[in-house]
UniProtKB/Swiss-Prot annotation:
The keyword Cytoplasm is annotated on this UniProt entry: yes
This protein's name: Glutamate-1-semialdehyde 2,1-aminomutase
Gene Ontology cellular-component terms listed: cytoplasm
Primary localization: cytoplasm
GO function terms (MF aspect): glutamate-1-semialdehyde 2,1-aminomutase activity; pyridoxal phosphate binding; transaminase activity
InterPro entries registered for this protein in UniProt: 4pyrrol_synth_GluAld_NH2Trfase, Aminotrans_3, Aminotrans_3_PPA_site, PyrdxlP-dep_Trfase, PyrdxlP-dep_Trfase_major, PyrdxlP-dep_Trfase_small
Subunit structure, as described in the record: Homodimer.
This protein's UniProt keywords: Cytoplasm, Isomerase, Porphyrin biosynthesis, Pyridoxal phosphate
Keyword DNA-binding: no
Requisite cofactors: pyridoxal 5'-phosphate
Organism: Flavobacterium psychrophilum (strain ATCC 49511 / DSM 21280 / CIP 103535 / JIP02/86)
Pathway: Porphyrin-containing compound metabolism; protoporphyrin-IX biosynthesis; 5-aminolevulinate from L-glutamyl-tRNA(Glu): step 2/2
Location of N6-(pyridoxal phosphate)lysine modifications: K267
Length: 428
């Protein structure tokens, strides 16, 4: 494939945008080459500025669960834009989507909308600290909760891709209140609680980690974490920015039957527009201003276009819940097909999957935390990435990102992808 127009656009972008991109992973720095500039997308496919078509497994990093330019979402946004794009006032639409979201997730009473997953997680931490009157939090190495200072401590895909697990600009004072645990290691978490008695406000975790590849929680881990938080009067925060409304109607909480105290949402809940949210029971949410002392605000929070897109998306998922079973079947089919051809071509690999999230690791050993995720062969991944790109398959340009499957993908698309993996893996 030729990428002449993308190359020209990247050179122009570099003159006025740091690194030529507005989110670092898009720059292809870890895989080399020139980033592909998108021109349009529809269904399972994205089209670049050179006219190339790709089967898309990024899906805007997760939101496009029903495919690109999903008609009910597009129609809702167009119609809403005709009556105004932003008001800075409450609207009926905000209440409508809030009611629907609360009805879909069994353990939340109220929800506050923000503009991104980063804002959602940042606000959830502030709320937890205010509610518990404690300062420290526990996060897990390799889990990414946005680019807020508190979270940029071994933050997974973005940080490790660029070799800077702790970002300059994060103060030592902020860092000392962020305690780091190993994913899937409950004893490690117990030790942190024991060493910081009555100081820990919350534990925040991706119930399925998605920023060191796709890492499932081991059996009993989330339940033990829930119990440990309860015993220590700390809040459990699930960052469901990736998993919310994707793994099930009620997200990872429903899938694993474990309930958190605060839940963060993003991606799917916005239907492709900038939306984040955090939610909890009344007792906790009533601590937020204007009801309570914990301040949180946003000029564009509850933006009518974003709310229209999110409402259309959630309605589609709520009214067609068989989509989750279809996604499970499609992703299982894809994962097995990829595993079979990699094995037949003698390529060392491990594939992790939960629902419609999957990752390919070029390592023979199980991948269950940040340290094991880093053992993969990055040189092999680079060849794999560029080989698939040349075949018309677009996966994330980082070995530490998850593939997101959309319902727009047909079995013909999946077979096309498996054949591409077969062809590429013969030369790895």
């Amino acid at each position: 494939m030729l990428y002449k127009r993308s190359s020209q656009l990247f050179l122009e972008a570099e003159k006025v945008i740091p690194g030529g991109v507005n989110s670092p992973v898009r720059a292809f720095k870890s895989v080399g080459g020139t980033p592909i500039f998108a021109k349009s997308a529809k269904g399972a496919y994205v089209y670049d500025e050179d006219g190339n078509r790709f089967v898309d497994y990024i899906n805007s990093w997760g939101p496009m669960i029903l495919g690109h330019a999903y008609e009910p979402v597009v129609t809702a946004v167009i119609e809403k834009a005709k009556s105004g794009t932003s008001f800075g006032m409450p609207t009926e639409l905000e209440t409508e989507i809030a009611k629907l979201a609360v009805s879909m997730v069994s353990n939340i009473d109220k929800i506050r909308f923000v503009n991104s997953g980063t804002e959602a997680c940042m606000s959830a931490i502030r709320l937890a600290r205010g509610f518990t009157k404690r300062d420290k939090i526990i996060k897990f190495a390799g889990c990414y909760h946005g680019h807020s200072d508190s979270f940029l401590i071994q933050a997974g895909s973005g940080a490790i891709t660029f070799g800077s697990p702790n970002s300059p600009g994060v103060t030592s004072g902020t860092a000392k209140d962020t305690l780091l645990a190993s994913y899937n290691d409950i004893q490690n978490v117990k030790n942190l609680f024991d060493a910081n008695k009555n100081e820990i406000a919350a534990v925040i975790i991706e119930p399925v980690a998605g920023n060191m590849g796709c890492i499932p929680p081991q059996k009993g881990f989330l339940e033990a974490l829930q119990q440990l938080c309860h015993e220590n009067n700390a809040l459990l925060i699930f960052d469901e920015v990736m998993t919310g409304f994707r793994l099930a109607k009620g997200g990872a909480q429903e899938l694993f039957n474990v309930q958190a105290d605060i839940v963060c949402f993003g991606k799917v809940i916005g239907g492709g527009l900038p939306v984040g949210a955090f939610a909890a029971r009344n007792e906790i949410m009533n601590y937020l201003a204007p009801l309570g002392p914990v301040y949180q605000a946003g000029t564009l929070s509850g933006n009518p276009l974003a709310m229209a897109a999110g409402l259309a998306m959630l309605k589609a998922l709520n009214e067609n819940q068989e989509v989750f079973a279809r996604l499970e079947e499609k992703t299982a089919y894809l994962a097995k097909g990829i595993a079979d051809v990699l094995t037949s071509n003698n390529v060392v690999h491990t594939i992790n999957r939960v629902g419609s999230m999957v990752s390919v690791h070029f390592d023979a050993n199980p991948v269950f935390d940040f340290e094991t995720a880093k053992n993969g062969d990055n040189d092999t991944f680079k060849k794999f990435f560029h080989g698939l790109l040349a075949e018309g398959v677009y996966i994330a340009p980082s070995a530490y990102e998850t593939w997101f499957i959309s319902d727009a993908l047909t079995y013909e698309d999946l077979d096309f992808t498996i054949r591409a993996v077969d062809k590429v893996s013969k030369n790895l």
